[in-house]
Amino acid sequence: MSVLITGVGVVAPNGLGLAPYWSAVLDGRHGLGPVTRFDVSRYPATLAGQIDDFHAPDHIPGRLLPQTDPSTRLALTAADWALQDAKADPESLTDYDMGVVTANACGGFDFTHREFRKLWSEGPKSVSVYESFAWFYAVNTGQISIRHGMRGPSSALVAEQAGGLDALGHARRTIRRGTPLVVSGGVDSALDPWGWVSQIASGRISTATDPDRAYLPFDERAAGYVPGEGGAILVLEDSAAAEARGRHDAYGELAGCASTFDPAPGSGRPAGLERAIRLALNDAGTGPEDVDVVFADGAGVPELDAAEARAIGRVFGREGVPVTVPKTTTGRLYSGGGPLDVVTALMSLREGVIAPTAGVTSVPREYGIDLVLGEPRSTAPRTALVLARGRWGFNSAAVLRRFAPTP
């Protein structure tokens, strides 16, 4: 059974919607800049990937506005766009034949911080009743399923930056178990003081003040990453079911998925990223020689970049495959990062061009990777590998294949 991606919805700092985002990525235009939603002058980090051109009332019903955090509003919008793109009308499909699987790493930080201020300053009676679910990691799954009447198997996953790929992998398993269509992906937003402090506490956030030089994975100047908001929601379908409803094309196939967990620090055992890569390739029934491009996790932290480069090198050989990190144009989007990379990979497969790693210029020779720099690289890729790692040991990998219509 093939699991196809038939629709995508993108909400990114450098583009709302697929076409603006893809154009920005190819041009190397980033959406990074100073945080403007609160005063960051007292904080060591001041840059983020903000979505500044999103006006929620233009995209979701007014009744949902008081119920939802910014991350959920973005997720609902992306889901709407993905379903429209897939030409899938939920009202014409059986409710139990549609599921929702999303990932979330931050929860409803903005909503909850606001309600906590009310609690502390005005008392418990001032707290919104919607706080009971607006903060929760599973809220995007719930709101999407309610909005579109999707009553099939649904769930939520939490694995920081790796969670979005995990969600897509679980959606694929759900389809293979008999659910014809699953809406899946990840969106995060935590650009409020409470969320900002939590992110800075990781010790991995860039303190640079120049957006052009703040997030440089695999570069000699790498010194942390820039966090961002947004992500992507995708429509995944069983190929036969998609064709039965009249959908005869797709962005590509989700051919393989795998997740691993790193051993305890100091154990002496190897990290799990290489194993995740090999498991995903095995799941896809393909070998390293068939992979045409790797969309790397690209932590932007020197020791993490070096570890990822070693894992890629052990699987593919020194400079054995083109590698790219288009997320330098958006920042790291936590659960939204993996699904957005999947969309970028699918577009690369469809358009025959590998998106570049914007901003990076000086890759240490010892990394031994063929990083795509400066300009898009025109090729004819057929298979892509997407990687993601989350704090505390999460590793995920996904294999994508170019769509091949049935003769």
From Swiss-Prot:
EC category: transferase
SUPFAM superfamilies listed in its UniProt record: Thiolase-like (SSF53901)
Coiled-coil spans in chain: none
Superkingdom, natural source: Bacteria
Additional record remark: This putative ketoacyl synthase lacks the active site cysteine.
Family that this chain belongs to: Belongs to the thiolase-like superfamily. Beta-ketoacyl-ACP synthases family.
Name of the molecule in the record: Actinorhodin polyketide putative beta-ketoacyl synthase 2
Species of the source: Streptomyces coelicolor (strain ATCC BAA-471 / A3(2) / M145)
